[in-house]
Structures are given as C-alpha cells and as structure tokens.
Swiss-Prot record:
Keywords: Antibiotic, Antimicrobial, Immunity, Innate immunity, Secreted, Signal. Male-specific peptide with moderate activity against Gram-positive bacteria. This is Andropin. It comes from the Eukaryota. Pfam families: Cecropin (PF00272). Belongs to the andropin family. It comes from Drosophila sechellia (Fruit fly). Its main location: secreted. GO terms for cellular component: extracellular region. Induction: In response to mating.
Amino acid sequence: MKYFVVLVVLALILAITVDPSDAVFIDILDKMENAIHKAAQAGIGLAKPIENMILPK
C-alpha cells in the first residue's frame, strides 16, 4: 500500500510540474501503478484461501 501511495503522489507531482510533451513519464508511472495494484490484488486473492486452510474458523 505504501508503494501505491508513493506512486500516486509522484504522478500528481509530475502532472503538475511537467509540460504536456513530457506526459510519457506520467503514462509510464500510471502503468506501473496499475500493475502493482493488480499484483497486490492477486496476492491477496491467493493469500486468503491459504490463510483459511491454516487458520480455520
């Protein structure tokens, strides 16, 4: 979650400070942010069933 927040803040700073011609960097950061978010969701999706097997209710 910390990485997600850092990437969002960096994207906002770049969006405010760069010219439209430099928007490629923002696009790259946005793609990295989406990839990290999807990986985190997949990790949580995999961890929950394993956690339920180890620690039954």
